[in-house]
């Protein structure tokens, strides 16, 4: 307890630090994408992209249907050409917690002949699976922003 620590070590806990720092937090990230198809073929490709994320965030049933497995996780990266982007933040492994779709982002209902929408807006919400610690920055050069 606090009194014991004060007597044995001469140290006092700073109550302001406790108020400020309640523990490590998991970071959340949100990304919005406008996906516009110029043809029905591109529209089908967009549908596959949307399904990839919606299905990837869904829990997986075990073969016996008695248990659920965790959904897929995602490794996010910003790229500058083919290289990692040093001026933007890095991410730890993330879970996709939300996938919101807007089917009429411009306020107009427009489809191709097969019914596929001409434009979608997808907003993805990710949360890192572990907090960022001071020591995590050791893996980056001084010229990188890190996490």
Predicted regions and their residues:
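Acidic, Ser/Thr- and Gly-enriched intrinsically disordered low-complexity segments
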Residues: 1-147
């Amino acid at each position: 307890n606090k009194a014991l620590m004060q007597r044995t070590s001469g140290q006092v806990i700073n109550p302001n630090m406790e108020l400020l720092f309640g523990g490590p937090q998991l970071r959340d990230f949100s990304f919005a994408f406008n996906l516009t198809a110029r043809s029905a073929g591109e529209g089908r490709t967009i549908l596959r992209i949307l399904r990839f994320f919606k299905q990837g965030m869904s829990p997986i049933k075990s073969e016996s249907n008695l248990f659920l497995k965790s959904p897929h996780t995602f490794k996010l990266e910003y790229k500058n050409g083919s290289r990692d982007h040093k001026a933007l933040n890095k991410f730890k492994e993330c879970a996709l917690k939300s996938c919101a779709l807007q089917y009429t982002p411009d306020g107009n209902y427009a489809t191709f002949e097969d019914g596929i929408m001409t434009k979608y807006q997808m907003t993805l919400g990710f949360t890192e699976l572990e907090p960022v610690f001071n020591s995590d920055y050791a893996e980056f050069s001084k010229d990188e922003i890190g996490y």
